[in-house]
Amino acid sequence: MPRLKRSEAERRGAETAGPDFLEALARGLRVVQAFDREHRQLSLSDVARRVELPRASVRRTLHTLVHLGFAATDGRMFRLTPRVLNLAGAYLMSNAISDILQPAVERLTAEVGEACSAAVLDGDDVIMIAHASPNRVISVNAQIGLRLPAVSSSLGRVLLAALDDRQLDRLLGRIKPAKLTSATVTDRAELRRAIRKARDDGYALVDQEVEAGFRSIAVPLRRLDGSVIASLNIGAHSNRGGADAMRSLLLPKLRALAAELQNQMI
């Protein structure tokens, strides 16, 4: 396990910061930086070795990050969550992600004439990070920053499909699915089947479970290494063609865009 080397600037900063320097904050930021493309999940011992800090200090830091929602754990391995993006503020959200995804969903909306969105998983919800609609109103609720239940939305189900069975069972055992419409699936066994189907099929289609009269289809967006980073969907009023039409006409467009964007994801 390679160690995370401190830059010369970091060393000088710590040495010359003076009495107001917060060592605990510095340790916390260093623990966050232990995770990268090659180290997406780490054990407590792995983190301690990489940052060269005592296990007790790293344990407290990781516990705090999990408690605040910036990290997640299965009891042994730790990983960062999308909430870490908040640490970088608007710059990271608007420039690193939306600068790629927002023009892409706008282009797809112009091509298919339906609403298109992108989202990331945050806990039990998805957060919409890019959205475009045609001139007509599709959904009064759709907007960047909107949170939706992951288990009920097409954007969320393709993200949950990337979880292993143990992680999925833990999530389904924890949540209390809300009955958003008369069509919303709340039975945990049915939700498990729907998410596993999304895993097998490579897409999820949700019919009026989040909003009455609104149907959507989604695919995962992957990094170059194959890991899922976000999801893309197309949504339309249920009177604008059926589910089969979505699969035959819109799904190929979504998959083509996801394949194109994969080359830009790091």
Feature locations, PLM:
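Short, solvent-exposed recognition segments
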Residues: 2-11, 137-210
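Amphipathic alpha-helical effector-binding/dimerization core
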Residues: 77-175
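N-terminal helix-turn-helix
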Residues: 2-99, 259-264
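Juxtadomain coupling helices with adjacent low-complexity linkers
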Residues: 2, 228-266
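Short loop/turn motifs at secondary-structure junctions and domain boundaries
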Residues: 110-111, 208-213
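Short hydrophobic beta-strand micro-motif common in sensory/regulatory domains
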Residues: 215-219
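Sensor-regulatory modules in signal-transduction proteins
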Residues: 221-224
